[in-house]
Amino acid sequence: MKRSKAYRAAAEKINPENLYSPLDAVRLAQETSTTKYDATVEVAIRLGVDPRKADQMVRGTVNLPHGTGKSPRVAVFAAGEKAAEATAAGADIVGSDDLVARIQEGFLDFDATVATPDQMAKVGRIARILGPRGLMPNPKTGTVTLDIGKAVADIKGGKINFRVDKQGNLHIVIGKTNFTDAQLIENYTAALDEIVRVKPSAAKGRYLKKVTFATTMGPGIPVDPNRTRNLLEESVPA
């Protein structure tokens, strides 16, 4: 793939053989962003698990203290009073059979979903559409619930879901390049703590194998996966 001049210039500032501290990586990500807008900062983590085995699946939710820098669009499957509760909490799309039908026709203009338990039989009809996109409501992540208002408010406030893919990778947005160093590091710390907390007992060997920071359309920055504490401390030059 042919890279842009801006991308190549940014990549020259990064030593691919070095493992940067998270703080240095955040600063490099901001410095090497190649977009004219505030780019998204994403973290890719390679885990030492075999996702093909049910007892090594890694998934969960985390409340990022500073959000992602984006107000996610939330679709809610609910009816009656619960639909009204969802709307009052700030849900962007609320429906039941009608919302299922729209999604079957190709509508996917939302970032997260929530459903009341009584709606799940209907939502099951579009599981093949929502599931592969990580959009299927799930009681384990608090998105199948009767407390619709809180679920919507949590997502709007920075709660994100994560799930390991078939290759053992996790991708998490920790903010944008206009965030402060501290905001990005605190979001990363919150995500990392939760990922470590849900480590499967069946996972053997090294759990955090590889960590990479990157901005939208920017080069990857290798990060030391062993740096998991006191991340706001200045790094010590080697």
UniProtKB/Swiss-Prot annotation:
<keyword id="KW-0694">RNA-binding</keyword>
<dbReference type="Pfam" id="PF00687">
    <property type="entry name" value="Ribosomal_L1"/>
</dbReference>
<keyword id="KW-0678">Repressor</keyword>
<dbReference type="GO" id="GO:0000049">
    <property type="term" value="F:tRNA binding"/>
</dbReference>
<comment type="subunit">
    <text>Part of the 50S ribosomal subunit.</text>
</comment>
<keyword id="KW-0687">Ribonucleoprotein</keyword>
<dbReference type="InterPro" id="IPR028364">
    <property type="entry name" value="Ribosomal_uL1/biogenesis"/>
</dbReference>
<keyword id="KW-0810">Translation regulation</keyword>
<comment type="function">
    <text>Protein L1 is also a translational repressor protein, it controls the translation of the L11 operon by binding to its mRNA.</text>
</comment>
<dbReference type="InterPro" id="IPR005878">
    <property type="entry name" value="Ribosom_uL1_bac-type"/>
</dbReference>
<keyword id="KW-0689">Ribosomal protein</keyword>
<keyword id="KW-0820">tRNA-binding</keyword>
<comment type="similarity">
    <text>Belongs to the universal ribosomal protein uL1 family.</text>
</comment>
<dbReference type="GO" id="GO:0019843">
    <property type="term" value="F:rRNA binding"/>
</dbReference>
<comment type="function">
    <text>Binds directly to 23S rRNA. The L1 stalk is quite mobile in the ribosome, and is involved in E site tRNA release.</text>
</comment>
<keyword id="KW-0699">rRNA-binding</keyword>
<protein>
    <recommendedName>
        <fullName>Large ribosomal subunit protein uL1</fullName>
    </recommendedName>
</protein>
<dbReference type="GO" id="GO:0003735">
    <property type="term" value="F:structural constituent of ribosome"/>
</dbReference>
<dbReference type="InterPro" id="IPR023674">
    <property type="entry name" value="Ribosomal_uL1-like"/>
</dbReference>
<dbReference type="InterPro" id="IPR023673">
    <property type="entry name" value="Ribosomal_uL1_CS"/>
</dbReference>
<dbReference type="GO" id="GO:0006417">
    <property type="term" value="P:regulation of translation"/>
</dbReference>
<dbReference type="GO" id="GO:0006412">
    <property type="term" value="P:translation"/>
</dbReference>
<dbReference type="InterPro" id="IPR002143">
    <property type="entry name" value="Ribosomal_uL1"/>
</dbReference>
<dbReference type="GO" id="GO:0015934">
    <property type="term" value="C:large ribosomal subunit"/>
</dbReference>
<dbReference type="InterPro" id="IPR016095">
    <property type="entry name" value="Ribosomal_uL1_3-a/b-sand"/>
</dbReference>
